[in-house]
Amino acid sequence: MAKGHTSRSYSQRYAKWQAKFNAFSNPTVASTILSNVSPVAQQNFQTNVPKFTSVNENVSAVLTQYGITGPNRAIYQGFGLKVARALNRIGSGPALVNMINGLKGYYISAFNANPQVLDAVVNIITGSPTGYVS
């Protein structure tokens, strides 16, 4: 579900690094890394799953409103998750606007996506059809 990078605090990053670093002194490195990193990764996953689940639900509602059915829904669901990951990673502002504009251009040319629906998806995720959240 939540694929890619999600925002993490310094303490979360340090906890995961420390779990990996301490494992390298053990001969069974792989199993030690997995057992040490597992709680940190699980906590990060549990923190971020609700965000991305709500994105899927909100985008699904928009797609139903526009009458998009079948496999075409996957195009817009994928776009919505990319926008949500970008918002989660880089926050709002000009960088997000540039990323959204690039993604929209790509989805329009590669998947023949409807620009109005893409704008509605951006609006439901960011609160603004342009992606700029002040």
Curated annotation (Swiss-Prot):
Q: What is its main location?
A: virion
Provenance organism:
Sulfolobus islandicus rod-shaped virus 2 (SIRV2)
Cited function? Self-assembles to form a helical, filamentous nucleocapsid. The capsid proteins wrap around the DNA and maintain it in an A-form by non-specific desolvation and specific coordination of the DNA phosphate groups by positively charged residues. This certainly protects the viral DNA under conditions such as the extreme desiccation of its host.
> What's an example of a GO molecular-function annotation for this chain?
DNA binding
Q: Does the keyword DNA-binding apply?
A: yes
Localization per record: Virion
Q: Which domain of life is it from?
A: Viruses
Q: What Pfam families does the annotation carry? A: Sulf_coat_C (PF12193)
The UniProt keywords, alphabetically, are: DNA-binding, Virion
Keyword DNA-binding appears in the UniProt entry: yes
Q: Where is it found, in Gene Ontology cellular component terms?
A: helical viral capsid
Q: What is this protein called?
A: Major capsid protein
InterPro entries noted in UniProt: Sulfobus_virus_coat_C (IPR022014)
Instruction: Quote the subunit structure annotation.
Output: Homodimer.
